Every structure is written in structure tokens, then in C-alpha cells.
Amino acid sequence: MYGMQYIQQTIVGIDGSEARFFGYVADNSEEMEPDRIRPAILILPGGGYAMTSDREAEPVALQFLAKGFAVFVLRYSVQPSRYPVALLEAAEAMRLIRANADQWHVNPAQVAVLGFSAGGHLAANLATSVGDEDIREQGGMDPDAVRPNALMLSYPVITAGKYAHLSLIHISE
């Protein structure tokens, strides 16, 4: 029978916080492409690291699902959690997607991350070497194994210097 898998998991942060991981994965139909392997997208909603926006989560996920993607949304930990909690949760979400690629009919070499605002900041950190040491040492993961194959940034918080969004970047002390 043709349908959809709805995936819900909790990712526990290094500070004990709980991120929510959701997935929308269409089942393969025996009538239509029974062996179809889909590209995947991990969506990281924005919200200034104070919340994760509803409008940048499921509504966006459903649009990509309709285009044939396996789609995942991470409601990562926000305040009072501090860096690198959300980064490690995003890395774990990428690990989960690739570890379950066969079951979820996902091409592990075609996993993109889409981040909005603060989620764009998080996505950029995951995609570059910025957080590699934290991913390796605190997350116990190989940064290259959890790095996305493609990146989409929607009004990301990545400005440095004079116009930086310093109030949004919460670093552990």
C-alpha cells in the first residue's frame, strides 16, 4: 500500500535539552517507481535561537515533500541552551538520516540542509569546518560524515564584524 511514514524522534542535547526531529517520507509504490531513492532535505527553522518558527518548518517541509523529497525538520534546542548544543543536534539529525537511508528510501549522498535566519547560521556551521572540533570532541561524530551535500540559506545570520547579530549568538562560557 502506498502511503507515508511520519517519523518522530527526540534528540537529547549535551545539556539535557530535547530537540524534536520529524520526518516526512513517502512510501514507494509498486505501481510507480518501486525502487525509488529520494534526495533528502533537513530543515532548520529560524527564531533567533529563542524559538523555532512554525512557518519555516512543516509548511516548507510539505512543499518539498510534494516535489519528491524525503523531508526532515529539526526543532533544535534554543535558549537557555548554548553553543554547541544545537550544532550537535543538527549533526545527530544528519547522522540519523544517513543511518536510516535504506529504510527511508533516501540517497545518503544527496542530503541538503535548508536553514532560515538562526537556522541558516546553524546550517552554515554544520556545512563548514567552523564546528568540526565540537562535532568530533563533544558529539563523538566524524564531521565529514554529517556534513550536508548541499546547502540552502534563507536570510541567514552569518554577518560578522560591525553588523554582526551578536545578541543571537549564545556561546558557552
Which residue ranges define each predicted feature?
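Conserved small/polar residues in nucleotide/adenosyl-binding loops
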Residues: 169-173
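Catalytic nucleophile-loop/oxyanion-hole region of alpha/beta-hydrolase
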Residues: 52-54, 74-108
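Primarily recognizes the serine-hydrolase "nucleophile elbow" in alpha/beta-hydrolase
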Residues: 95-166
